[in-house]
From Swiss-Prot:
One of its GO terms (cellular component) is host cell plasma membrane. It comes from Bovine leukemia virus (isolate Japanese BLV-1). Residues 457-515 are cytoplasmic. This is Envelope glycoprotein. The record marks R301, S302 as: Cleavage. The keyword Amino-acid biosynthesis does not apply. SUPFAM superfamilies: Virus ectodomain (SSF58069). The gene is env. The lineage of its organism: Viruses, Riboviria, Pararnavirae, Artverviricota, Revtraviricetes. GO terms for biological process: fusion of virus membrane with host plasma membrane; symbiont entry into host cell; virion attachment to host cell. The chain crosses the membrane at residues 436-456. A motif (CXXC) lies at residues 212-215.
Amino acid sequence: MPKERRSRRRPQPIIRWVSLTLTLLALCRPIQTWRCSLSLGNQQWMTAYNQEAKFSISIDQILEAHNQSPFCAKSPRYTLDSVNGYPKIYWPPPQGRRRFGARAMVTYDCEPRCPYVGADRFDCPHWDNASQADQGSFYVNHQILFLHLKQCHGIFTLTWEIWGYDPLITFSLHKIPDPPQPDFPQLNSDWVPSVRSWALLLNQTARAFPDCAICWEPSPPWAPEILVYNKTISSSGPGLALPDAQIFWVNSSSFNTTQGWHHPSQRLLFNVSQGNALLLPPISLVNLSTASSAPPTRVRRSPVAALTLGLALSVGLTGINVAVSALSHQRLTSLIHVLEQDQQRLITAINQTHYNLLNVASVVAQNRRGLDWLYIRLGFQSLCPTINEPCCFLRIQNDSIILRGDLQPLSQRVSTDWQWPWNWDLGLTAWVRETIHSVLSLFLLALFLLFLAPCLIKCLTSRLLKLLRQAPHFPEISLTPKPDSDYQALLPSAPEIYSHLSPVKPDYINLRPCP
C-alpha cells in the first residue's frame, strides 16, 4: 500500500493584512508636495567694500546631485578655498558638521571649470574662438554655470561668487539626469549679452525648472549695485575679465518706488554718483511648502486611545483572518466535493473494466480447454506442444482490485490543520459549523469597521481640506516699468564697449509674486 500523502495548506499570512491596514492608515498622513520658487532678494550680498562676496548652497541634496551627475563622475575634489589662484564655487557643510575637528570648505571642480569671469581662457571650455581680436575687457562673453539639481527640495540660496571681478554670468540651471554632453551655445555668429535682464534670467530658470513656481520678494531694496569703474584694458589677446569692482547696497533714496520695486527698463548699466553701476539680482530657490509650513508640534495622545486603537486593530485583523479562512474552507469543501464525484466515476470505470477482464479471461480459458480436448481426441498432444509454443494463450493480469483499494475517499486524505483556530467539533454537523464560522467572521469584520470607519472618514476629510488649502493661488498683477528718464543711463565715450550690454526690454506682463 502506498504511503498516504497529506496536503497541508498554510495559514493565511496575517502579515499581509497588517501591511494593508497600515498602508490604509498611512493615507491619513498628508503627502508632501514639493513646489520650488525662484525669489529675488538681497539676503546673500555683502556690504563691505573690496571683499569677497561668496554664496552658499546649504543643502545636502546638492552634494548628492553632484555625486550622481554624469559630468562629475571623474572630477577631482578640493578642500581649499582657491585652486590655481582663483576661487572656486563651494558648498559649505551643514551647520554643526565638522570634519577633522574643524569646519572645512568642500569645493568641487566640475563642468564647467570656470563658472566665473576671471578664469584663464585655456581653463574655460566656454571661451569663444571668435573673440581672438584685440578687444577690451568688456567684450568677455557669457559664462554658463551648470548646477546639477536632483530635485527642488529643501531651502537653499543660489547666487554667484565675486572676487574682484564683475560677475557677468548667464545661468543655465539643469536638473539631473543631464544629457551625456552639455549643450553649449554657439557664439561664433552673434554676440550674446552677458546679462540681458532679470526677465531673461527668470525665463531661463523657468525653462530649466518647469515644475517649480517662480516668484520674488516684493520688498526693497530689490537688487544690489555693482560699481564698475569707467575704464578699459587693452591686450593683444582676448579680454579675460572686467576691471575690479566694488559691491554695495542699493541706495533706497535713489531707487525708491511706491511698489517696492526697482525695474531697469532698457539697460542694467547706470551712472550713479560713485561711478558706473551694474544692477544684478541675487537668486534664491526656496521651497514654498517648507518655508510656509508652521513648525511641527508634538501632539500628545492618551494611553486609552492607543489601547483602544491597538485593540480595534487586533480585533479587525482577527476578523479578517477568520473571514478569509472561512471563505477558503468553503472553496476547499466545494473542490473536494467535485473531486470526489470525479473519483467515484473513476472507480465505476475501474470496476467495469475489472468485470470485462474477468469475462475475457473466462472465455480464453474455455477456448483453451476446448482446443486441448480436440487435439487429444485426434491423437495429438495438447495445443501448445503440438505447435511447439511454450505459451500459446494470453495470460490476463487483473490489478484493478489493488488500484481500487488505494482509492480512498478524498475527504479522508486531506488534512484539516488549516482549521487550527476552529478545531472543535461539539458534535455538530458540517453545515452548522460552517454557519457558525461565517457568522462569527462577519461579526468581527463589522466590529472592526465600526472601530476604524470614524478614523478613516476623519483622515480623508482632513486630507482633502488640506489639499484644497494648499492649492496655489497667485494674484495677477501688471507691473509698469519706470520711464527711462527716471534713471540716467550711462553713455560712455566708446559706445561699442557697452553695445552688447544693452539688454532688450524685459517683459513685465503677468508676473506673479509669491503669496
